Amino acid sequence: MKPLIALVGRPNVGKSTLFNRILREKAAIVDPTPGVTRDRHIAEGHWQGREFRLMDTGGYAPEDGVISTAMLEQTMMAIQDADIIIFLADVRSGVSYDDLELAKILKRDFSDKPIFLAVNKAESPQLAIEAASFVSTGFTEPWAISARDGSGVADLLDEILLTFPESDGPPEEDGAIRLAVIGRPNVGKSSFVNALLGSNRQIVSSIPGTTRDAIDTRFTRKQQEFMLIDTAGLRKRTKISAGIEYYSSLRSERAIERCEVAIVMLDATPGIEKQDLKIINIAAERKRGVLLLVNKWDLVEKDSKTSKQYEESLRSHMGNLSYIPVIFTSALTKKNLYRAIDTAKEISQNRSRKISTSALNRFLEEALAANHPSTRTGKELKIKYMTQIEAPWPVFAFFCNNPELVQTNFRKFLENKLREKFSLEGVTISLRFMQK
């Protein structure tokens, strides 16, 4: 197992900047506004040939208020999970009460873990000297660094490396199914993840957009490992201000790129909106498996026909995406929670299904007998055979006399029949017609 390093400290001391410096990429949201990184974010990094996991956290800020209290809880959870702790402070602000309180907790409750006090923003020799004043926290070796320009960071990482186990062990086969939980803000994505895991992994509140960054969490069900990515939601472009919310939206789209199956969450109470359809389309265009999860179903007044009518209305709006399965759930009551995960697993299996050429050509023979293709020009379309092309999603090649003779309705007929015959529910199918 790769060692887990946690970055902890009060808000705005530069944790996200150091996180990005160590990983050499803009993996966490960085903004001068205190409290921007409000949850835990984990990514993999490496130094001097050794691999590790790095965790960025919300700031330690023991104040009243919904977000600040939740951030404190998340910081404590991060410290408990970590193998190594980087306690980050700000030399320009000096030693604060919050620094002393966090230092007291670290020394009292986590003395069994390697803890490194890094005093950030020491961009000049004078500031580096002033970092020595942080011995008052009880940590006798403060490291003067600048996450902004990188000074001192390499030396800090070299020292941290000495606490690593001698070997990372044999490489593990990662058979986890990657699921991205996406949707408009405040539809219940974090509540869904928390209900599923039975742990307050995400900060959850009624304030839209509480989960600003993408958080990866692993869990196992029926001996199958999953990686859940809970995102901040894809905002309407016109509602995204320059800065944090815009970047969060981009991160959500990146989460789609990383996943195999996108679980698109809808809020049952207002019904489907244009932004919901746009999110579904983004996932389908990226050739990901898609599952629609209609959340807050417990809030809808219903009878025996309500779910059927709702699904029919939903599919009428989806057009060509009606192949996507729909599940009604409630993160609050946990209705159909595990059914959703089991269905996502089936979709992942459908997406990676390999079908033999002989089975495909038997299918083609039956399909052509049922619906011989017609053309506008009067010329005959002759399809000789078909095969599956190697790809992360189902791609089928049809070899014919003239690809330009293939009409849209016949293409759609073949796609529907392929789904029906080979159980390809929830996945995008690509058909390619090639001349031969």
Swiss-Prot record:
PROSITE patterns associated with the record: G_ENGA
Domain of life: Bacteria
Matching InterPro entries: G_ENGA, GTP-bd, GTPase_Der, KH_dom-like, KH_dom-like_a/b, P-loop_NTPase, Small_GTP-bd
One GO-annotated biological process of the protein: ribosome biogenesis
Pfam families: KH_dom-like, MMR_HSR1
UniProt KW keywords: GTP-binding, Nucleotide-binding, Repeat, Ribosome biogenesis
Binding-site positions, GTP 1: 9-16, 56-60, 120-123
Signal peptide: none
A GO MF label: ribosome binding
Ranges in a coiled coil: none
Residues of the KH-like domain: 353-436
Domain EngA-type G positions: 3-168, 177-352
Tagged with keyword DNA-binding: no
UniProt: GTP 2 binding residues: 183-190, 230-234, 295-298
Keyword Cell wall biogenesis/degradation attributed: no
Known role: GTPase that plays an essential role in the late steps of ribosome biogenesis.
Entry similarity comment: Belongs to the TRAFAC class TrmE-Era-EngA-EngB-Septin-like GTPase superfamily. EngA (Der) GTPase family.
Subunit-structure text: Associates with the 50S ribosomal subunit.
Protein name as catalogued: GTPase Der
Organism expressing this protein natively: Chlorobium luteolum (strain DSM 273 / BCRC 81028 / 2530) (Pelodictyon luteolum)
Gene this protein is translated from: der
